[in-house]
């Protein structure tokens, strides 16, 4: 018996020791490395961090941590608790290489981690930034970037995938490494996140894209590239840098930085009703939508135990509801939609819509209730009816008061209807302006600034357009114009006819002398019929065309904010004896004085411009015996943007697309426009709205500059003093920021026009909001190289987009550059055949300024 007691006591002692050992094992500290970087440079600040953790089941105890280098104590820290973190910092020297140890212990045990640190000398050579091969003198032992690297920027929507290529020329004998970094554009790659590091085994040769540049590099060099697949996040802007370096630092490093712009207006989101209540037995459509292109959407019916507060969403117990399709269920490109027929109570619950590609989800609470005829009355509180009744009473009372006000206003205004007779005055401040518009002076067309173009030292000033009222009359008697406005539409029509007949009796013939002016009228009727304005326009014998020889058809060519353009037929106009088709501009019924002012100014500027094969030609005016009409030559193929878009698969609606635009054809179009702008510059004209939509395509496919609604005649520059709707994506920085316009600001717009031509009608800065364009331009962002543009054409675009206007070419220089490019392009000579097949492409076009910016 005593022996059994002894065995039990020994067993209890042994179990106590085992429990003590297991507790010590459970409660000894564990260490974790936070930093794993082992290779450092001198002068860098080394940061080593280790973290100690004790099991939460243990009591808090004293933790001690010590740092050693090669067994020499560096520092220590003591804390009471279950966690401890300690960071060791030091600015490095070469002798700081060695074995660093983090040692931690408590009464239950200890742990340690080791860092084997290698410190090397800081780089003492320069990192070349954007060192692009440009044809200048080269050195043998240098890395050069491919010339087309300077053309690569990206503007995308969130979650777009981009494939970037870092292309470069390298000596054959060098082993290279290419590192890709992502960082803020306000900082450099030193503090960036390393995305990938390519060794020599992942760097490929790129012979095809480098073939034309092999003559510019040393014989012992090779063309290589490294690529990165990058998915853009929802950040507005980030930069990606590729760093090229040799393994042994035998040559200078080279790097290039890509800018990635993400349109914040396209942040991904889901639309899923947060709650819905439906009646038992009815049909219900559950729909989830997103703005993400080509999405994968799921709709789940959530398990009742689902906890929305849990940061990790588990759907294992939920039902994938979107698979329960019947014949009426459907899934479109950007939505998941399910029609549930004959709803019952089993459908009540919570539903979750999620996007497979992104961590986005929305939850709907669906309630199925039993409905009856008196359900609404029984379920809605009386207070709701009282609130609704109160608001209905307020609305009815407001309507009654408003009706009384209108009745009173009409009674007062009925005594105030009157007619206003106005005259349009064109004042010529410059003594030479009339000789300009009469074509009696000779001008140079190969220079730009107006000071060298004027026939004498006097500045060329545009005419001043004034509109002044002549009489305000309340009676219509004894030949005076004015009558109380009748209240019925029939009376209004009769009054209008009476005014026309009365005014016909006051027609003055347009004299033939330069100083002979007679006035006629134009009729404006306001939209409210409360007054009429009678406009009298100056008559110019040189441009006046008999109204009876002009026939206007019903074919509308375009319509703007205050004007319309119709096709017409003119007899004996200009030097043509046969009837020809023309375009006729006219005012709409509801125009204002400001519209008349702008219309007449555009008409006067077209007189001043004169004739050039690449500028739309003014043929005549009808200012007498009827409404104002402006006659210009007809461009049967519409505007250039629609013309080139007909060959672009993204825009063309034609089932049959004949032929393709060659580089030679597109360069020829660009050359014609440059010649037209050279001529306008010689006439002291700044266009201010040069774009593909304002270039018309003539009968023989000649380019014609048109739409002079924003055009001004200037002496060196014109400063806009007022704000208005402007084509900001085509405007130069100084025009946007300083409202300063010169011929060089037209050169900037010409560069954008070139980009439109060679992209076959794409919109510039397509993913960027107009208000953000200015800031991006100031940061150096440019439209990417079009696929159809060669290296020389894109260089010309970039030259036109120089931030400093002094660094841009003038139009005469652009003409010379394009002639040189066309002579070197080896295209098949089938341009005329191709054009003859395009007759089916005659498109309607707007001859006026568009209603909104594209």
Curated annotation (Swiss-Prot):
Q: Where is the active site?
A: 689
User: Does the UniProt entry include the keyword Nucleotide-binding?
Assistant: yes
What's one Pfam family here? PK_Tyr_Ser-Thr
Sorted UniProt keywords: ATP-binding, Disulfide bond, Glycoprotein, Immunoglobulin domain, Kinase, Membrane, Nucleotide-binding, Phosphoprotein, Receptor, Repeat, Signal, Transferase, Transmembrane, Transmembrane helix, Tyrosine-protein kinase
Tell me the lineage of the source organism. Answer: Eukaryota, Metazoa, Spiralia, Lophotrochozoa, Platyhelminthes
Coiled-coil residues are none
Show which residues sit on the Extracellular side of the membrane. Answer: 21-383
The entry assigns this protein to a family as follows: Belongs to the protein kinase superfamily. Tyr protein kinase family. Fibroblast growth factor receptor subfamily.
**Could you tell me which species this protein originates from?**
Dugesia japonica (Planarian)
**Record gene name:** FGFR1
> Which compartment or compartments is the protein found in?
Membrane
GO CC annotations on file: plasma membrane; receptor complex
User: Which stretches are transmembrane?
Assistant: 384-404
Name of the protein described by the UniProt record: Fibroblast growth factor receptor 1
An example Gene Ontology molecular-function term? transmembrane receptor protein tyrosine kinase activity
Taken from the record's topology, the Cytoplasmic segments are 405-854
Query: SUPFAM superfamilies from the xrefs?
Result: Immunoglobulin, Protein kinase-like (PK-like)
Q: Which PANTHER family match?
A: FIBROBLAST GROWTH FACTOR RECEPTOR HOMOLOG 1-RELATED, TYROSINE-PROTEIN KINASE RECEPTOR
Query: Can the keyword Mitochondrion be found in this entry's annotation?
Result: no
A biological process (GO) of this protein is: cell surface receptor protein tyrosine kinase signaling pathway
Chief site of localization = membrane
- EC number of the protein: 2.7.10.1
**Domain Protein kinase intervals:** 551-822
Disulphides: 50-102, 166-242, 288-353
On tissue specificity, the annotation reads: Expressed in brain, stem cells and the mesenchymal cells.
Q: How does it sit in the membrane?
A: Single-pass type I membrane protein
Record-listed ATP binding positions: 557-565, 585
């Amino acid at each position: 018996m005593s022996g059994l007691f002894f065995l039990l006591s020994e067993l209890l002692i042994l179990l106590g020791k085992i429990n003590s050992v297991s507790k010590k094992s459970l409660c000894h500290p564990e260490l974790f490395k936070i930093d794993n970087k082992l290779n450092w440079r001198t002068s860098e600040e080394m940061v080593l961090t280790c973290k100690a953790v004790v099991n939460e089941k243990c009591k808090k105890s004293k933790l001690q941590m010590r740092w050693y280098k090669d067994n020499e104590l560096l520092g220590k820290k003591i804390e009471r608790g279950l966690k401890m973190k300690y960071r060791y910092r030091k600015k490095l020297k070469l002798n700081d290489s060695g074995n660093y140890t983090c040692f931690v212990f408590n009464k239950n045990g200890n742990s340690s981690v080791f860092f084997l640190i290698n410190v090397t000398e800081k780089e003492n050579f320069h990192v070349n930034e954007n060192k692009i091969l440009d044809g200048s003198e080269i050195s043998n032992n240098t890395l050069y970037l491919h010339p087309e690297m300077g053309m690569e920027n990206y503007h995308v929507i969130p979650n777009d995938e981009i494939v970037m290529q870092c292309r470069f020329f390298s000596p054959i004998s060098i082993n290279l490494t290419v590192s890709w970094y992502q960082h803020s554009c306000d900082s450099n790659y030193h503090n960036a996140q390393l995305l990938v590091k390519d060794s020599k085994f992942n760097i490929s040769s790129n012979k095809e894209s480098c073939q034309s540049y092999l003559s510019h590099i040393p014989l012992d060099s090779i063309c290589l590239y490294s690529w990165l697949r990058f998915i853009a996040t929802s950040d507005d802007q980030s930069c990606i840098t590729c760093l090229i370096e040799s393994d042994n630092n035998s040559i200078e490093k080279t790097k290039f930085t890509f800018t990635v712009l993400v349109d914040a207006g396209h942040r991904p989101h889901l639309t899923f009703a947060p709650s819905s209540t439906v009646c038992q037995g009815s049909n219900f459509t559950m729909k989830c939508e997103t703005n993400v292109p080509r999405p994968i959407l799921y709709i789940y019916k959530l398990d009742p135990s689902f906890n929305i507060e849990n940061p990790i969403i588990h759907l294992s117990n939920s039902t994938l509801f979107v698979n329960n399709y019947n014949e009426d269920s459907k899934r479109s490109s950007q939505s998941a939609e399910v029609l549930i027929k004959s709803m019952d109570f089993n459908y009540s619950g919570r539903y979750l819509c999620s996007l497979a590609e992104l961590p986005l989800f929305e939850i709907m609470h669906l309630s199925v209730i039993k409905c009856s005829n008196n359900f609404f009355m029984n379920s809605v509180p009386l207070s709701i009816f009282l609130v609704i009744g109160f608001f209905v009473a307020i609305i009815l009372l407001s309507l009654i008061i408003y009706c009384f006000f209108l009745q009173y206003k009409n009674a007062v205004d009925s005594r105030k209807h009157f007619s206003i007779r106005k005259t349009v005055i064109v004042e010529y401040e410059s003594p030479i302006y009339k000789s300009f518009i009469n074509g009696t002076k000779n001008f140079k067309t190969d220079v730009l600034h107006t000071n060298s173009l004027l026939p004498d030292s006097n500045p060329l000033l545009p005419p001043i357009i004034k509109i002044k009222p002549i009489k305000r009359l309340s009676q219509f008697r004894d030949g005076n114009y004015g009558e109380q406005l009748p209240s019925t539409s029939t009376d209004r029509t009769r009054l209008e006819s009476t005014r026309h007949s009365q005014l016909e009796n006051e027609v003055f013939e347009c004299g033939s002398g330069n100083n002979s002016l007679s006035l006629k009228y134009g009729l404006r009727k306001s939209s409210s019929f409360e007054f009429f304005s009678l406009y009298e326009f100056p008559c110019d014998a040189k441009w006046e065309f008999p109204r009876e020889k002009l026939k206007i058809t019903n074919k509308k060519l375009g319509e703007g904010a205050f004007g319309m353009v119709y096709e017409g037929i003119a007899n004996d106009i200009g030097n043509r004896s046969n009837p020809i088709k023309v375009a006729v501009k006219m005012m709409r019924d509801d125009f204002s004085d400001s519209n008349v002012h702008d219309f007449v100014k555009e008409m006067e500027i077209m007189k001043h411009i004169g004739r050039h094969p690449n500028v739309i030609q003014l043929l005549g005016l009808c200012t007498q015996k009827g409404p104002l009409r402006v006659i210009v030559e007809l461009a049967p193929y519409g505007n250039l943007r629609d013309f080139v878009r007909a060959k672009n698969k993204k825009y063309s609606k034609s089932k049959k697309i004949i032929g393709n635009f060659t580089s030679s054809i597109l360069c020829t179009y660009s050359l014609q426009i440059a010649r037209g702008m050279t001529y306008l510059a010689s006439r002291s004209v700044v266009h201010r709205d040069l774009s593909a939509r304002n270039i018309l395509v003539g009968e023989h496919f000649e380019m014609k500059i048109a739409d002079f609604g924003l055009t001004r005649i200037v002496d060196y520059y014109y400063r806009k003093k007022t704000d208005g709707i402007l084509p900001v994506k085509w405007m130069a920085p100084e025009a946007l920021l300083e409202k300063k316009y010169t011929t060089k600001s037209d050169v900037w717009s010409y560069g954008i026009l070139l980009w439109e031509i060679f992209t076959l009608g794409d919109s510039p800065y397509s993913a960027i909001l107009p208000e953000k364009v200015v800031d991006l331009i100031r940061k150096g962002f440019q439209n990417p190289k079009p696929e159809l543009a060669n290296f020389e054409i894109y260089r010309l675009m970039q030259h036109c987009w120089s931030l400093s206007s002094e660094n841009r070419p003038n139009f005469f220089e652009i003409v010379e550059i394009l002639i040189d490019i066309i002579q070197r392009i080896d295209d098949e000579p089938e341009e005329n055949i191709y054009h003859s097949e395009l007759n089916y492409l005659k498109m309607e076009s707007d001859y006026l300024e568009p209603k909104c910016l594209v």
